């Protein structure tokens, strides 16, 4: 993966951003710019978005550009967006939750530019929408694999920030763990960063030192997996198939496939019929999936997970189905009750089986 990225950057890097491709005659009036919170070489969140960008450029013929490692909560984001608009880019895709307020303000300022925000909830009626995926679906499946793999009964979860997106993933993962291994527990350690390999690795090591023999994560690098590999533990990565970084530790990963969604956004802009929405795609839509399961995982486990995957896609299984209690034993869902989207999107509690605090 990194060799492909290096070749791409070697061709087109300058002034802190990269312009890629020349577009087509049909798409001459539409140009799409992507703002990334991490480096393209993270092999995780940003890498997955850049794969989607490349796919969209190839499918639509539209010129694209990107800028990487743009921090949240600073003036850098707005400055980069203004630079892109000055260059004629009229589709702006921001790929981090913390960009949301800036994107909302910029969408009002530039009504002729399409703004699409990944992972947020803000939108308007004209030129600003949001996109995300039901990652809790493959998170649940990956938890089934992890629960089947643990021998100590303790799984460490290295996580960035206590926001609903991350908490929802931890809970779905834990419910999958419990489906395979009801006595196993998941302990969360917060890093307060999306991408810092040193911090991620240290956090994973702290969990390994506590006796965890499987590490899961909501982070952007493979550092946690490398620590698991060194300790002889197992690992569930995130964002992409990171098996190359820790092949002996790797179990599976919930992964993103942004390309088709980006094609839809860009094609709508080209046709001048972009309509803002809150898109929350699923495994059935293809925006999220489960990476291949490691070859040394018992076939009975693979069969169990694939059966659950088929049931989720068919609408016969929902990870957040009652009875469901929070970690203090309070009932959240009654037997057979399915959690509504609004409750999932605002989730700020841990389910039973999680060790740690959301605060």
What residues fall within each predicted segment?
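Hydrophobic helical h-region of N-terminal Sec-dependent signal peptides
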Residues: 9-15
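A residue-level marker of the well-folded mature domains of exported/periplasmic proteins
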Residues: 26-359
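C-terminal motif of bacterial Sec signal peptides marking the signal peptidase cleavage site
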Residues: 18-21
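Bacterial N-terminal signal peptides that target proteins for export
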Residues: 1-9
């Amino acid at each position: 993966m990194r060799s492909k990225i290096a070749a791409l950057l070697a061709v087109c890097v300058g002034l802190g951003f990269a312009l890629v491709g020349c577009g087509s005659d049909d798409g001459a009036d539409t140009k799409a710019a992507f703002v990334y919170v991490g480096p393209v070489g993270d092999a995780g969140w940003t890498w997955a978005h850049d794969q989607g960008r490349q796919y969209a450029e190839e499918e639509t013929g539209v010129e694209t550009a990107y800028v990487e490692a743009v921090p949240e909560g600073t003036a850098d984001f707005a400055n980069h967006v203004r630079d892109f608009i000055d260059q004629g880019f009229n589709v702006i895709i921001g790929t981090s939750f913390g960009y949301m307020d800036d994107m909302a303000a910029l969408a009002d300022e530039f009504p002729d530019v399409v703004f699409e925000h990944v992972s947020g909830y803000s939108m308007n009626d004209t030129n600003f929408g949001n996109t995300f995926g039901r990652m809790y679906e493959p998170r649940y499946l990956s938890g089934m694999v992890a629960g089947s793999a643990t021998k100590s009964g303790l799984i460490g979860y290295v996580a960035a920030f206590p926001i609903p997106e991350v908490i929802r993933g931890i809970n779905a993962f834990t419910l999958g763990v419990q489906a395979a291994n009801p006595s196993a527990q998941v302990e969360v350690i917060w890093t307060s960063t999306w991408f810092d390999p040193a911090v991620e690795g240290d956090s994973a090591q702290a969990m390994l030192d506590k006796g965890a023999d499987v590490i899961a994560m909501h982070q952007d690098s493979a550092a946690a997996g490398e620590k698991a590999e060194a300790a002889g533990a197992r690992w569930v990565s995130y964002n992409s198939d990171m098996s190359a970084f820790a092949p002996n530790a790797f179990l599976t990963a919930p992964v993103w496939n942004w390309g088709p969604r980006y094609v839809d956004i860009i094609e709508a802009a080209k046709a001048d019929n972009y309509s803002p929405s809150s898109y929350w795609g699923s495994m059935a839509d293809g925006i999220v999936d489960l990476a291949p399961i490691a070859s040394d995982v018992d076939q009975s486990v693979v069969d169990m997970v694939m059966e659950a995957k088929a049931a989720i896609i068919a609408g016969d299984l929902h990870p957040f189905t009652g009875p469901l209690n929070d970690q203090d034993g309070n009932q959240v869902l009654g037997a057979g009750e399915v959690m509504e989207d609004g409750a999932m999107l605002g989730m700020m509690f841990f389910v039973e089986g999680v060790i740690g605090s959301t605060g």
